[in-house]
Each structure stands twice: as C-alpha cells, then as structure tokens.
Curated annotation (Swiss-Prot):
Protein name: Kininogen-1
Expressing tissues: Expressed by the skin glands.
Gene Ontology biological-process annotations: defense response
GO molecular function: toxin activity
Keywords: Amphibian defense peptide, Bradykinin receptor impairing toxin, G-protein coupled receptor impairing toxin, Hydroxylation, Secreted, Signal, Sulfation, Toxin
Pfam families noted in UniProt: FSAP_sig_propep
Locations listed in the record: Secreted
Signal peptide region: 1-22
GO cellular component, one term: extracellular region
Modification sites for 4-hydroxyproline: 54
Length: 62
C-alpha cells in the first residue's frame, strides 16, 4: 500500500511538472506572436503616414 501511494504521488508530481512546463512554453510563444503583431502594425503605420515636422498641416490656411 505504501509503495502504491509513493508511485501515485510520483506520477502526479511528474505530470504536474510537465504540464507547467508546457503551459510556460505556450505562454512564451503567445507573447512572441503578440510582439510580432505589434511590430508589424507599427511598421504599417510608418509606411502609411510619413513623419511630418511638428505643427505641420497639409492644409493651407490663408
């Protein structure tokens, strides 16, 4: 009975450790994907709107 408890505890512990490692890797990949998306969006914004000097307006005011 004692051997059964120890082996069951060991199996559950190893399962918990492997599960937490998988969750950590999953979280890391999601963060990397989000960072890539943010970088792509900022690059698109730079391409769409060129930088203008402060106070510059494309409209002429007479």
């Amino acid at each position: 009975m004692d051997i059964l408890k120890k082996s069951l505890f060991l199996v559950l512990f190893l399962g918990l450790v492997s599960f937490s490692i998988c969750e950590e890797e999953k979280r890391d990949t999601e963060e990397e994907e989000n960072d890539d998306e943010i970088e792509e969006e900022s690059e698109e914004k730079k391409r769409e709107a060129p930088e203008r000097p402060p106070g510059f307006t494309p409209f002429r005011i007479y």
